[in-house]
Amino acid sequence: MAAYTATSAVGVGLGPLREALAARRSGLRRNDFGDGERLDTFIGRVAGVEESALPASLAGWDCRNNRLAWMALQADGFLDRVAAARKRHGERGVAVVVGTSTSSIGASEEAYTRLDGDGGFPADLARPIVHTPHSLGDFVQQALGLRGPAVTVATACSSSAKVFAQAARLIRSGVVEAAVVGGVDTLCGSVLFGFNALELVSSEPCRPFDVARRGLSLGEAAGFALLEREGSGPRLLGWGESSDAHHMSSPHPEGLGARLAMEGALSRAGLTPADIDYINLHGTATPKNDEIEADAIAGLFPASTWASSTKGWTGHTLGAAGIIESVIALLALEHGEVPGTLNSAELDPLCGPQLRLDNGQRRCRHVMNNSFGFGGNNASLLFGYA
């Protein structure tokens, strides 16, 4: 991992993220998003997106989602690290693989509220690229000056975890020498009211794995990482992917897909469950998701493994959850600062000894990140040092 960065409700870049995790300072706040009717809930909203602007050369991609992407790309020297990789490998030697669940749908929603007299989109939003699922991927490729493969992954909440697997396959097959991976999702009406229609949204800050959890808190975020065939730093050691095909919005009742994804990551990395020091869980604070994931963790990993959900800090950032929580796992790997589970007070009895409420310090050799999406799209990633 040549470089990585994350922007969420707790701030822009790695510094604010580490500080918020250590101080157990949540980025969640009462919903103040949008005009008119607002849901009674808490959200993880990124400050400054509305006031930010894209460079003139990228104005054609302007929308809230791409503005958040640009904010994240500028943090932690990430643009410079990609520029150096572009110089080493050439414009076509670096792929872009990004994940998103809603892309720029917020811009499409706005366009439909401001149709012109002929029923068409208003002039300022009559830009087809921002109304496609590939808006994010196309924007990131243009912003970074790259000309290699560009892929947008949209597998709901596992989107920006699955990008790591796709990028690794591109590198291992010799198609490219490096890849920029990441994910971005922003809040919009479709997200807030859609999840509320499924009765998954809590009216209080989310409490993952708590016995009295009431649902999720939605958030927005952007994050990126640079993967290279050769180099120093933490490595992607393994990944596992599975598809439940059980239900549109509920996981397999026995956690079959979740377990297969975790076992696949362990197998590809040549590791055993006892080798994993920390797992960043999907842990959305919905009743069924947490119950099934907790049972899978308890049945697969020894008591010595530490596990937690960090959605109490950022909210559930949907298609960006995979990258944001991979970055948090990478921080634990590099610095030994392992987060607990924020806002929760009493763990569900179904949780095993792996689940932790409090932060802790421990030397981590191998860390895992779980991302499980609607439709049973599951991905588990394993990071460590080669």
Listing of model-derived features with the role each one plays in the protein:
Residues L79, P133-G137, Q141-L144, P149-G183, ...:
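Active-site-proximal alpha-helical scaffold in enzymes
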Residues V175-A197, S202-R213, W239-P253, L281-D290, ...:
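Acyl-CoA/ACP chain-elongation machinery
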Residues A6, A56-G77, D124-T132, A150-K162, ...:
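Active-site pocket-shaping loop/turn-to-helix segments
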Residues T100-V151, N289-P302:
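Active-site-proximal gating segment of KS-fold condensing enzymes and close homologs
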Residues M1-A2, L14-G15, E19-D32, R38-F42, ...:
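Condensing-enzyme catalytic core mediating Claisen C-C bond formation in acyl metabolism
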Residues V10, G15-V98, S104-A107, A261-P273:
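Conserved active-site "lid/cap" helical segment
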Residues M1, E91, P273-D275, C351-A386:
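Flexible, low-complexity linker/loop segments at domain and module junctions
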Residues A3, L21, V96, V140, ...:
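Conserved small-residue
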